[in-house]
Amino acid sequence: MKLAVLYAGQGAQHPGMGKEFYEASPAFRAAFDSAVLDFDLHRVCFEDPDGVLNQTEYTQPCMVAFACGVSAVLAEQGVKPAYVAGLSLGEYSALEAAGVFTAKQAIELAAYRGKAMADAASGIDCGMTAVLNLDRVPLAECCEQASALGCVQICNYN
């Protein structure tokens, strides 16, 4: 049987993610610790005392570091996916799992991407949301009505 792995994008993060893996697995630790970042990855992922984990410049490297660590644990156990894919940010984790990037490269690229996205939105009153279980037509109608207040658009459908 062939295994396919789908890596999560932004939005699946939560404080404490990966902490038990980090404490238990040298393979997870090696992947997780491989990148050089300008913030304390452990503190943000495992504790999030300042509530910054949901800010894109922190979310993105945290999610990719977690995924790279999990991939390292799977590889250590002899589990090698035949197929990998990622949802948006998860593409970086999938590329690392496929051997295109090292964990260090994937995490550092995600940090760069997250910072660029945060900088692009800096000073702009903006936001985004995930809408679940609503058909496209009523969603488009809601966006059209809300457009009277400012720019409201559907970005993508997952």
PLM region spans:
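Helix-rich "cap/lid" substructures immediately adjacent to catalytic or cofactor-binding pockets
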Residues: 1-85, 134
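Alpha/beta catalytic cores of group-transfer enzymes, especially the acyltransferase/condensing modules
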Residues: 10-12, 37-42, 98-158
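An amphipathic alpha-helix/helix-turn recognition signal
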Residues: 30, 62, 88-89, 101, ...
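Short, glycine/charge-rich beta-strand/loop segments that flank catalytic centers
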Residues: 47-51, 85-89, 114, 126-130
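Hydrophobic side chains within alpha-helical segments
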Residues: 63, 70, 94-96, 116
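Gly/Ala-rich beta-loop-alpha elbow adjacent to hydrolase catalytic centers
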Residues: 67, 82, 86-90, 94, ...
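Alpha-helix C-terminal capping segments
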Residues: 73-77, 95-100
